[in-house]
């Protein structure tokens, strides 16, 4: 199951973004203010997207990214200056002030990419070597 987790130090900002996502039909798994809470929500889903700000109450976005499994992607919402030097792998960025249209399109694109990778993983699992086929029979 793909989960979307919204993490911002200001609970009101996180709730507003969650309401925006729910309004367009996206399923939001959780809203939180700390990276530890986000990791707790991440344990409850197979894969997902973390929508977060640059600095959380207990850690920076880069620390949270390091702690998350590879099945998770991150959408960083921050001013351009915060991520000018580049972003880590698995992190996409949107500049503040954010437009609802840009947020929705970016999340849809990330969800499509995750779906494509999931299908690709399933195909590789189904293809077996002749030795594996012989063991099964």
Name each model-derived stretch:
Residues 14, 35-39, 46-72, 79-82:
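Conserved phosphotransfer microenvironments
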Residues 98-111:
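C-terminal output helix
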Residues 63, 78-96, 105:
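Alpha4 helix (beta4-alpha4-beta5 surface) of REC/receiver domains from two-component response regulators
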Residues 8:
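Conserved acidic carboxylate
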Residues 11-30:
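Two-component/phosphorelay signaling modules centered on CheY-like receiver
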